[in-house]
Amino acid sequence: MKELILQREFGKGFDFHLRNAGLDFKEVQIISNAMMKAMKHGTLNLKSFSLSYNPEIIYQGVGLLVKAFPPQIRELGLVGCDLGDEAGEGIYQYLENSALELVCIEGNNFSSVLMDKFKKLREQKPNLSLLI
């Protein structure tokens, strides 16, 4: 994958799911760059995003993604991506100020300390379904 172009979608938005697609950090860079470009032009009507079961996206990839997500995104899936606390902290910080309603991040390698932080955040945000 060298380039990804996201085109304007009308209506309620679209889902972007590439589960178990063998993606790595380089491809995550392409995806996040495309999202940033589309958002800059007001054309990123993304409602659901999942890169679950792509263990090569690494924590730097997660860092790029959380910077590229549009404000209207409602669902996030990063299940079984072999993510550790560094990526988890990035997700946590994003969740604190986002309007996400469903987040599925189970099957990663988060410490018990970070898991407790996620559980407290889930209690503070009753509109958030958080699967850890």
Regions found by a protein language model. Name each.
Residues 1-132:
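Leucine-rich tandem repeat or coiled-coil scaffolds
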